[in-house]
Amino acid sequence: MMLKSVTESFAGMIHGLKVNHLTDGIIRRSKRMILDSLGVGFLGTGTEVFHKVTQYSKIYSSNTSSTVWGRPDFRLPPTYAAFVNGVAVHSMDFDDTWHPATHPSGAVLPVLTALSEALPQIPKFSGLDLLLAFNVGIEVQGRLMHFSKEAKDIPKRFHPPSVVGTLGSAAAASKFLGLSLTKCREALAIAVSHAGAPIANAATQTKPLHIGNAAKHGMEATFLAMLGLQGNKQILDLGSGFGAFYANYSPEDLPSLDSHIWLLDQQDVAFKSFPAHLATHWVADAAAAVRKHLVTPERALFPADHIERIVLRIPDVQYVNRPFPDSEHEARHSFQYVACASLLDGSITVPSFHSQQVNRPQVRELLKKVKLEHPPDNPPSFDTLYCEISITLKDGTTFTERSDTFYGHWRKPLSQEDLRNKFRANASKMLCRDTVESLITVVEKLEDLEDCSVLTRLLKGPSVQDEASKLSSMSSFDHTTLPRFTNI
C-alpha cells in the first residue's frame, strides 16, 4: 500500500524498523553516544541548574516512578525523571553534537532509561530493545534536519534539540512501547506542538531545560497518543506544521525499510573534551598550537604582558561571540574566553568555567586584546568551519596557527579508551569505582543485555550505606580535570 504523506512515512519507519535493521556500525556508534551521555549526565547532577529543576520536580508524584541518575533515594514520575536527567546531560554543554547541528542523545536516552524502569513488561526490555529505540529517536532527528538547508548551519533563531529532539524523544518512546503506526503518527503530531525554544536563552541556566523539556514532552506526547489524543495527520508535510520552524523546509517521503540506511552510519557525532559550545573546540585547538611558539622550556609561563593583539578568524556565530563573559554559562559560549583560557593555562578543563577562573584579572586583561574576524570562506557549519589564531607581540612578531579539525570531531574521533576515560572522570563525581567500571562493561555489551534493569540499577548510584565506600574510592580519581587524551 502506498503511504499517503511524509508524516505517515515517518510513522511507518518508527513502527517498522526492527532489531535486524541495526548494523554493527550503528550499534558501535550508538553505544559510544550512550556511554558519553551517561557520563556527562552524572557530572551534570552536581550543577546548580540540576539542583533547581530537581527541587521543582519534587512537587510531582506518581504510582510509577523512575531513577534520577546517581540519586538512589530520589525517584520521580517517568516524565520528570526524563526531564531532570535530560537537563543534567546538557547542564554543562558537554554532550555530543551532530551534523546537521543538534545534540541528539540527551533528549532520547533519559526517556528510555525512565520507561524501562517505570513500565516493566514481560518479556523484559532488552539492551537491543533500548538500542533500537535509541537509534530510531536519533534517526528521526537527522531525517527532519535534512529537510532544511538552514539546519546544516549553526542555528541563529532556535535551539535545534528543542525542536527535533522533542520529536526524537516521541519516536524513541513510541518504538520502545510498541505503538501502532497510527499511534506513532499521532505522537509525532502532538510532539510538534510541544517543540521549540529560542537561541537567545543560550549561555543561560535555561538552555539545559531545552533538552530536558524535549525528553519530557516527547514522552508526554507518546502517552497522550496511547490514550487516543489526535493531531494533524500531515504535521510533517505542512509549512504550517513542522515547517513552521524552518524558512526553507522541503520534506520528502522516506525510502522503504527494505532500503533503509541509517544516517548515523553515514555521519558520526562529535564528542567534546571540555564542556563548552562545539565551535569553541576549534579555538582551543588552534590556541594550543600557537601557544607552543610562546611557552618554551626557557619560558614556562604564557607572556601575557608581551601580547599586543589576538585575532580569531572564525565563523560569524553571534551567540558564541561574548567578549567579556560574566558567568560560567556565558564563558562556555565565548570564543574569546576559550581562546584566552587556552593560551594562559595550556588546556581547557571542567574547572576552567568556574567563576573564579572566568573572572581572573589575567583573563580579563587578555580579553581586551582579542579581535574577531569572519572570513567569507568560513561559514558557520560544524562540518566545514575552521579557526585561525594570530598573536602579535609588542615587538611586532606574529605567530599564526589554524585548526581545521579538533580531536573529538567525527573526522578525528576520540579513541575508545579516551571515551572511557572521559566517562570515568565524569561519572566518578557521583559513583564509586566499581559502579563506574560496571557501567562501562554493561554499555559496551549492551546488545547482549537481556534485561535493562541491570543498567537502571547501576544508574541509581550508591545507597546511603554505600556512601562512605564511595567517598573512599573517589579519592583515587582526579575530579578537577579530565584525563589527558592520548591521541591529541
From Swiss-Prot:
- A Pfam family cross-referenced in the UniProt record is MmgE_PrpD_C
Q: Where in the cell is it found?
A: Mitochondrion
Q: What is its EC number?
A: 4.1.1.6
Q: Which UniProt keywords apply?
A: Antimicrobial, Immunity, Inflammatory response, Innate immunity, Lyase, Mitochondrion
The effect of pH on activity is described as: Optimum pH is 7.0.
> Which GO molecular function annotations are given, in alphabetical order?
aconitate decarboxylase activity; protein homodimerization activity
Subunit structure of this chain's protein: Homodimer.
The family annotation for this protein states:
Belongs to the PrpD family.
- Name of the featured protein: Cis-aconitate decarboxylase
What organism, scientifically named, is this protein from? Answer: Mus musculus (Mouse)
